[in-house]
């Protein structure tokens, strides 16, 4: 079983979850505890613009740090990769100016010998596009797909597809229809109009 931990400290520049704000000392202590548990990585241990502290954390621990889903544009992720702020960039095409920019981020990460694990792409069509990118990258071991049933079941995000992807034993097949592989369910369009 692969376990990753998301501290969710990069969502905004303010404390959006009262009582859950991490400082450097808390991030360091937690990272050391997670190392002992063989957790694969610690995602977003500090606010997204605390680059110096995240890089310092990377130097102090062996557990990789991941993040970047809320950083905007290629320029922000380029800086994070160059300065070793995140070991595993986790771009999100809905924030990063689309699939073309996401593709560039994956190539950049590969050039720096880093894994790249995109976020879920907002589900629906973005999720299908992310799935194709992950399948084409040798440095993408998997793609993050939110699944929090019953309300946040990943299948809800793909309900507009005539051919929704299914997760089976932790794997999801790439959609095979032309383009991004997505076929929109015409009944969904008619029911929403």
Across the structure, where does each feature detected by a protein language model lie?
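Shared catalytic-loop signature of beta/alpha-barrel
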Residues: 38, 47-67, 71-171, 175
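Short acidic, gly/pro-rich beta-turn/loop elements at beta-sheet edges
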Residues: 15, 101, 184
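Extended hydrophobic packing segments that form well-structured cores
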Residues: 178-193
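Metal-dependent enolase-superfamily TIM-barrel catalytic cores that perform enediolate-based chemistry
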Residues: 1-55, 60-61
């Amino acid at each position: 079983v692969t376990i990753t931990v998301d501290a969710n400290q990069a969502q905004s520049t303010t404390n959006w979850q009262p009582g859950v704000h991490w400082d450097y000392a808390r991030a360091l202590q937690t990272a050391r505890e997670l190392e002992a548990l063989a957790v694969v990585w610690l995602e977003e241990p500090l606010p997204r613009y605390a680059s110096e502290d995240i890089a310092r954390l990377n130097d102090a621990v062996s557990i990789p740090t991941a993040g970047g889903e809320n950083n905007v544009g290629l320029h922000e992720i380029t800086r994070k990769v160059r300065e070793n702020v995140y070991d595993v960039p986790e771009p999100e095409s809905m924030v990063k100016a689309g699939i073309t920019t996401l593709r560039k981020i994956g190539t950049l990460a590969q050039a720096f010998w880093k894994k790249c694990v995109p976020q879920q792409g907002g589900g629906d069509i973005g999720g299908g596009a992310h799935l194709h990118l992950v399948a084409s990258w040798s440095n993408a071991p998997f793609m993050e797909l939110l699944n929090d049933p019953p309300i946040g079941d990943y299948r809800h995000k793909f309900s507009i597809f005539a051919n929704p992807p299914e997760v089976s034993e932790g794997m999801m097949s790439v959609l095979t229809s032309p383009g991004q592989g997505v076929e929109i369910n015409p009944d969904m369009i008619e029911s929403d109009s």
